Curated annotation (Swiss-Prot):
GO molecular function: phosphatidylinositol-3,5-bisphosphate binding; phosphatidylinositol-3-phosphate binding; phosphatidylinositol-4-phosphate binding; ubiquitin binding
Annotated region (Disordered), positions in chain: 1-22, 327-425
Gene: ATG18
Protein's organism: Debaryomyces hansenii (strain ATCC 36239 / CBS 767 / BCRC 21394 / JCM 1990 / NBRC 0083 / IGC 2968) (Yeast)
Amino acid composition bias (Low complexity), ranges on this chain: 399-413
Key word Calcium present: no
Skewed-composition ranges (Acidic residues): 349-386
Protein's name in the database: Autophagy-related protein 18
Length: 562
């Protein structure tokens, strides 16, 4: 193992001139495109303590907890398309892109980095789309098969035949987490058909288990021919557990919480994020990420299951809070819909996602109030299909569940509101357009709160969506840069320039230069750290105020390809 090295590039986003910064980043980005170390794959390990990069000429591994630094690098004349770590052990799994002689996207190598030796090689019938590791299981995902191995012996335990899964969607929870043996695998379900009042999942063959033919699986689905459902599979018993009805359109991202109790999903529209209970299949939360369709790259839970993060092609990372207040808001909406359906059975709730919607990319935060109709498939359910999270999780501050509060709370006319509870405002992201959008949303939210019981669901759900608790904008140069993000549980004290946060009511345009002359200009804040890695080869650390939410603050930036 190589010794930790000092960071080659360390940029404090709060202290730099923005124009010089953009010029510097632009020049670096141009050199990246022509470099041999272009990034093919990025991932965190299971406890988010390390980052692994698959490069054109090998791979790199970095520590990111407690301190950032490179801990291992292996250069070879092979493009690495997939890399997966097993926590912080010396065991990794890699898959080549197949661009060189002897390399193949169908070949998996298990490598001991400490001894620099190959433990074993496995050849599969088609391209490997995903590799997932836990302490007891290794999952190999092909387009139409899933292979389950015992990590300790590398013995094949089970094979699952699936419908085509070209996007390589699957997620694996940790095993034996907090004494719970919730080792679950989640992957897209084939379309369903209704036969004799019972739902059957077509095309699922489980080879090597007790059921070698089509399985009857417990399902919460009540609609045929859906393509946005998720199968939950127990990797310990090697049996399917349930099918969760997530979306009517195709899935874009899915993830299980570390303890295997929660499932988060997003469709290819990228406007709605949903969270389900794995045990019951019931929808616990529904959040609106934005209005216009976009590509969601990844979803991730915090390790305490209090937050869900979504990265997307818009270059924005949205943070959704899983709290009692958010759960109650979802439940109240469903309760109103249920009452209206009982009074008028022919009442039509919001229609499903329209495939012909305007395919306009998000602006800064996708916050124009317009309905995309993604939440109709759950509005017909009864009130009991939404569970309320116990209040013991945490006490939530008033009006913190909607991200649009984060920008116009500073301009609120409510004199009784404590400034310390107002969401943070990032002046570097402030613009007239954003202020106008946020102000219009505030009016809509207040109108919905007053008139929600009288308006049809189609309109009240438009005016009163549950939006993100916080967000951040990645300082990327190019568009559609892929990114992954994870949030740490530990609250840390960071020093942030006051000019970075102070609102300027008379001058809403973003400041061009934020500088720190003395220590008096720094404001101590207790923040949760959010780590973001992009395909440009950058690692960012942002700070999230867990009480106020709003805009996350760029704390550090590192370049990974030096």
């Amino acid at each position: 193992m190589l010794k930790n090295q000092s960071n080659s590039v360390h940029v404090d986003g709060s202290h730099n001139n923005s124009s010089n910064y953009n010029d510097e980043v632009s020049s670096i980005a141009k050199s990246i495109r022509n470099a041999d170390e272009s990034v093919n794959f990025i991932t965190f390990n299971q406890d988010a303590s390390c980052i692994a990069l698959g490069l054109k000429n090998g791979y790199k591994i970095f520590n990111c907890k407690p301190n950032f630094g490179k801990c291992y690098q292996f250069k070879k004349n092979e493009s690495i398309g997939k890399i997966e770590m097993l926590y912080c052990t010396s065991l990794i799994a890699i898959v080549g892109l197949g661009e060189e002689v002897g390399s193949s996207p169908r070949k998996l190598k298990i490598i001991n980095t400490r001894r620099q030796s190959t433990i074993c090689e496995l050849i599969f019938p088609s391209t490997i789309l995903q590799v997932k590791l836990s302490k007891s299981r290794m999952i190999i995902l092909l387009e139409e098969q899933i292979y389950i191995y015992d990590v300790t012996t590398m013995k094949l335990l089970h094979t699952i035949e699936t419908s085509p899964n070209g996007n390589g969607l699957c997620t694996l929870s940790a095993d034996n987490c907090d004494g719970k043996n919730n080792s679950y695998l989640a992957y897209p379900s084939p379309p369903k058909t209704i036969t004799h009042d019972s739902l059957l999942v077509n095309g699922i063959n489980t080879n090597g288990g007790m059921n070698s033919i089509q399985n009857n699986i417990q399902s919460v689905s009540n609609s045929p021919n859906r393509i946005g459902d998720v199968i939950i599979f127990n990797t310990t018993t090697l049996q399917p557990l349930s099918v969760i009805e997530a979306h009517k359109s195709a899935l874009a991202a899915i993830t299980l919480s570390t303890d295997g109790t929660l499932l988060a999903t997003a469709s290819d529209k990228g406007t709605i994020v949903r969270v389900f209970s794995v045990a019951t299949g019931l929808k616990l939360y529904q959040f609106r990420r934005g209005t216009y369709p976009t590509k969601i790259f990844t979803l991730s839970f915090s390790f305490d299951n209090k937050y869900v993060l979504a990265t997307s092609s818009s270059g924005t990372v949205h943070i959704f809070r899983l709290g009692e207040e958010e759960s109650l808001e979802n439940k109240h909406k469903r309760k109103r819909n249920s009452k209206k359906l009982k009074l008028n059975p022919e009442y039509e709730t919001i229609t499903e996602e329209n495939e012909n919607e305007i395919q306009k990319d998000d602006a800064e935060d996708d916050d124009i109030i317009q309905d995309d109709g993604d939440d109709s498939d759950a509005d017909d359910d009864d009130d009991e299909s939404l569970e309320v999270i116990p209040s013991k999780h945490r006490k939530l501050s008033q009006d913190s569940n909607n991200s649009f509060t984060s920008f116009n709370s500073a301009f609120s006319n409510d004199d009784n509101k404590d400034n310390k509870s107002e969401p943070l405002i990032d002046q570097t992201r402030l613009s007239v357009a954003r202020l106008i959008r946020r102000s219009s949303q505030t009016l809509g939210r207040k109108a919905a709160q007053k008139m929600g019981d009288f308006l049809p669901t189609r309109f009240s759900s438009i005016l009163e969506p549950t939006r993100n608790f916080a967000s951040l904008k990645i300082n990327s140069v190019s568009k559609d840069i892929k990114s992954i993000a994870i949030i740490n549980n530990e609250v840390q004290e960071d020093l942030v320039p006051q000019a970075y946060l102070n609102a300027k009511e008379n001058n809403p345009s973003p400041p061009k230069d934020i500088s720190v002359n003395t220590a008096k200009d720094l404001l101590p804040l207790n923040l949760l750290h959010i780590n973001v890695v992009t395909s440009e080869g950058y690692f960012y650390t942002y700070g999230l105020d867990p009480d106020r939410g709003g805009d996350c603050i760029l704390l550090h930036q590192y370049f990974l390809l030096d």
